[in-house]
């Protein structure tokens, strides 16, 4: 488990990421104004209405909904799993490259070696229905680059993605590791036939999702 946040701050980050009708750009604007997420929920509706629409300001000033409380409790339970982490936008472990994109996620759900988020990364992606030669090349390139200290990032899809992860894992503990960026929730492996690969990445690399 990794939760290097006071309970109040953790709950506020969760609510901020789950608040209906609150976009990530609006959430970042609120954070710039308030500093910490729990400070947002200490603001009066009138003050919040200067930053977001009045209806949303009223919701932010009210108590969290039962759905948000339930989701927060589930996430806290999820964090009890081995090497399960939450990395917020304000966390030093948050990937620096993500901070440069237009709409960085407020929170990342992570399973595995969180230190890899700060590693030099090379992304490898390609066809799901790849040729034998393409798969072999992806395995070889990823293996070589991982041996040189690069963390190989891909999407855990069939074909080239899976080959890139496998090639990086072949470099072993002395290699740069591999990072699987998931388009699903952190607890959902898609495609399911890559479940064993996902477990191996969780043990020897890192799985990352914003969901």
Give residue spans per PLM region:
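Short, small/acidic-rich helices and loops at N termini and domain boundaries
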Residues: 1-93
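Glycine-biased, small-residue-rich flexible motifs in mid-sequence functional cores and linkers
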Residues: 2-9, 88-211
């Amino acid at each position: 488990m990794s939760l290097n946040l006071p309970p109040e701050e953790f709950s506020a980050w969760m609510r901020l990421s789950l608040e209906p009708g609150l976009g990530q750009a609006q959430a970042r604007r609120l954070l710039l104004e308030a500093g910490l997420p729990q400070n947002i929920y200490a603001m009066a509706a009138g003050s919040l209405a200067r930053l977001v629409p009045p209806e949303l300001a009223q919701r932010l000033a009210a108590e969290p909904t039962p759905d948000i409380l339930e989701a927060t409790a589930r996430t806290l339970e999820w964090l009890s799993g081995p090497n399960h982490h939450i990395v917020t936008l304000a966390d030093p472990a948050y990937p620096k490259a993500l901070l440069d994109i237009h709409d960085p996620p407020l929170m990342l759900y992570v399973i595995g070696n969180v230190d890899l988020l700060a590693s030099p990364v090379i992304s490898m992606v390609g066809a799901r229905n790849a040729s034998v030669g393409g798969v072999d090349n992806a395995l070889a390139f990823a293996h070589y680059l991982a041996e040189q200290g690069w963390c190989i990032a891909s999407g855990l899809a069939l074909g080239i993605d899976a080959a890139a992860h496998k090639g990086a894992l072949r470099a072993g503990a002395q290699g740069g590791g591999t990072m699987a960026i998931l388009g699903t929730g952190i607890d959902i492996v898609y495609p399911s036939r890559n479940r064993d690969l996902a477990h191996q990445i969780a043990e020897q690399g890192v799985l990352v999702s914003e969901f």
